Amino acid sequence: TLRDSEMPILFVAGATGFAPVKSILEDAFHRGVRRPMWLYWGVRHRHDLYLLELAQHWAREHPNFHLVPVLSHASPEDAWSGRAGLVHEAMLADFPDLSGHEVYVCGSVKMVEAAVPAFIARGLADDACFFDAFVPSGGKQPEPDAGQGRV
């Protein structure tokens, strides 16, 4: 569930990190949240965007929602003309100053540990950063320098 705020919201989902973000977005749409929202969804290949049609539908139906899929390992078979590279770097290219935003990050430990400090360095307030890292069985939760922890 989103905090009660007027700040624009940036979601960064790495691969299956889309699942918890999907839940938050569906709740926001149901409650009629009108704040600007962007979803940066990073995957390796085009076929990994497993519910792309749903996210595209949201972008058509909700003028305050914007979708930015990002492929990190695009191949010729992907026939991809969209954004490429690391998902958090794509977001930072579009939003170089994160002050006045809320950011929700969901994905692998490695992605969260790379993204959160980069976002804080770009002006994101500690109390406006929320993350949920997917830990392999037997692994440990990440310890980024800042952020609120679990979404």
Predicted regions and their residues:
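FAD-binding FR-type
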Residues: T1-F11, S23-H30, H45, L71-H73, ...
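Internal, well-ordered alpha-helical scaffold/interface segments
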Residues: A19-E26, E53-Q56
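Reductase modules of NAD(P)H-dependent flavoproteins
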Residues: P36-V151
